[in-house]
Amino acid sequence: VEEDTVSIQLAEDRSILCYSLEQIIAEKYRSLLQQRSRNRHRRQDVYDIYYLLTMYDEYLSKDEVKKMVLNKLKKCSEDKGIDAYLHKEGILDEEIKRMSLHDFKTLELEIDINNIDPENMFDRISNYFFSLPWWLVT
């Protein structure tokens, strides 16, 4: 059973419920795909996905994990008006890419992005998006 949330133990008698890694990535991709309909730029999500893909590369590269990410993306995208982008090349829509990278340099004022080129970040997250098992989508 794929869980959307996980419990994180903070102390012996305290824990918090938070999104699973797979759910976070699915939500971040949904947010990027939804930029056009919401007219919002999501540069932070590009960085967040890039960071998570870098930190958890081995785990996120597993076929079963990619399937979970795609299933969660499909589920969290229901009724969001982004069906036209829920396919392998959906992330390459020029307007989505433009909005994703809009004012990206201002992100450096908020967090240390280690001078990583935004285009390289977008390429990395696009490649992961391509690698999801889209042939399973009906």
Where are these regions (language model features)?
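Structured mid-to-C-terminal alpha-helical surface segments
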Residues: 1-138
